[in-house]
């Protein structure tokens, strides 16, 4: 014998209005769950963006300037120069005067700190290593901060990935489309490595 409850339930399910109510409640539950999930996704994405933007760039070296000759410390440097090298402390030296720890030997007279030799007032230099060394001057921090604020969207993939001043100066001083006037012509064929806010002036056609 079929229980009375089961019989009543079957009779209710046969009525269209009951099916409509069940369908409506299911639809409301589905939409509510979907919206809540979307809200959580948006909230998490916004939180991640805030955390990324709030992480400041490291403007100071991790150890004090002047101790580059101590082997206990390691320096990153500009690597690529055949004749000159700039380390992360701002010293520029001849490649032969580079220590095994990657730092310039500060005891060599030709080693210079924050040297702007070959650089013009607009922040463009004819030698990449001098561009990096000059860019690392503490007085250039505000200039670099202004550039980052303006370039955050246009160069987000490139400049928002840097973690400190040295990485920023390495990236900023590399020749880019800003230094090019035409496909194979630099705006300034001599001073083409720029850390400044603005590209070199266009050459007269």
Swiss-Prot record:
Topological category with respect to the lipid bilayer: Single-pass membrane protein
Biological-process GO terms, alphabetical: positive regulation of SREBP signaling pathway
Keywords attached to this entry: Glycoprotein, Golgi apparatus, Membrane, Transmembrane, Transmembrane helix
InterPro entries tied to this protein: SPRING1 (IPR019352)
Lumenal compartment spans: 36-205
Superkingdom, taxonomy of origin: Eukaryota
Transmembrane segments: 17-35
Positions glycosylated per UniProt: 67
Subcellular location: Golgi apparatus membrane
Cytoplasmic face residues: 1-16
UniProt keyword Transmembrane present: yes
Pfam families associated with the record: SPRING1
One GO cellular component term: Golgi membrane
Key word ATP-binding present: no
Family recorded in the similarity comment: Belongs to the SPRING family.
Function: Positively regulates hepatic SREBP signaling pathway by modulating the proper localization of SCAP (SREBP cleavage-activating protein) to the endoplasmic reticulum, thereby controlling the level of functional SCAP.
Record protein name field: SREBP regulating gene protein
Species this protein is from: Gallus gallus
């Amino acid at each position: 014998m079929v229980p009375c409850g089961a019989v009543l339930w079957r009779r209710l399910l046969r009525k269209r209005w009951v099916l409509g109510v069940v369908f409506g409640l299911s639809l409301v539950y589905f939409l509510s769950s979907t919206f809540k999930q979307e809200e959580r996704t948006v909230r998490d994405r916004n939180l991640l963006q805030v955390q990324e933007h709030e992480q400041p760039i490291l403007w100071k070296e991790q150890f004090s300037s002047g101790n580059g000759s101590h082997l206990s410390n390691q320096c990153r440097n500009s690597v690529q120069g055949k004749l000159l090298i700039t380390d992360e402390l701002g010293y520029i030296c001849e490649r032969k005067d580079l220590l095994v720890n990657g730092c310039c030997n500060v005891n060599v007279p030709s080693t210079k700190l924050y040297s702007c030799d070959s650089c013009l007032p607009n922040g463009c230099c004819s030698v990449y290593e001098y561009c990096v060394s000059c860019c690392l001057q503490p007085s250039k921090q505000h200039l670099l901060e202004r550039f980052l604020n303006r370039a955050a969207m246009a160069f987000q993939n490139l400049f928002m990935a840097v973690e400190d001043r040295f990485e920023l100066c390495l990236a900023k001083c590399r020749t880019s489309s800003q230094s090019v006037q035409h496909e194979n012509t630099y705006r300034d064929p001599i001073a083409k490595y720029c850390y400044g806010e603005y590209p070199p002036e266009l050459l007269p056609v």
